[in-house]
């Protein structure tokens, strides 16, 4: 697993601010088409985040599959108990099946910018290069949020390994 954090200037509401770009990547032993199919399921998000983050979707539940240009809102509970960030909004900016890229723009009261891009690249018939790239801005909390995100995305990629090893299926 590789992890990189870079500082970068980004636009936030017309102002140039200093944010971070976190990149977490690893090789995984799974067919890229199968990984792509799983990635589009909301159940996968809930599984890879559990127990570090539990979601309480506004309106009761997430859709079964994510859809491009769709917006969903949720409450996030750290470790299933502690509310964080108020309402967290995810806008599915891009779901590109050809290039296997899922990209969201996300925000809440703490993480003003949480832009997440997941890329899958085929290495062999049964292995992929999986990359999470997250651009983060949270004002004076940017460093703390980025440190937490680093731990969180490493954890998520380890949870992917459980999915692969146990061949976990999602509806």
Where are the regions a protein language model picked out?
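Short, highly charged C-terminal tails/helix-capping segments
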Residues: 57, 61, 162-171
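Generic short beta-strand segments
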Residues: 7, 72-77, 133-137
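A non-catalytic, amphipathic alpha-helix used as a structural packing/dimerization or gating element
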Residues: 151-159
């Amino acid at each position: 697993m590789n992890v990189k954090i870079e500082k970068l200037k980004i636009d936030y509401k017309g102002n140039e601010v200093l944010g971070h770009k976190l990149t977490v990547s690893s090789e995984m032993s799974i067919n890229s088409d199968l990984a792509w199919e799983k990635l589009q399921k909301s159940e996968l998000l809930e599984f890879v985040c559990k127990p570090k983050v539990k979601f309480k979707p506004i309106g009761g539940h997430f859709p079964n599959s994510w859809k491009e240009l769709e917006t969903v809102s949720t409450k996030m509970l750290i470790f299933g108990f502690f509310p964080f960030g108020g309402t967290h909004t995810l806008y599915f900016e891009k779901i590109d099946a050809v290039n296997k890229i899922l990209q969201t723009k996300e925000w809440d009261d703490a993480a003003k910018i949480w832009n997440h891009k997941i890329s899958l690249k085929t290495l062999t018939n049964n292995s992929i290069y999986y990359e999470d790239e997250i651009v983060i801005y949270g004002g004076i909390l940017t460093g703390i949020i980025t440190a937490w995100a680093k731990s969180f995305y490493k954890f998520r990629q380890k949870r992917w390994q459980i999915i692969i090893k146990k061949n976990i299926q999602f509806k």
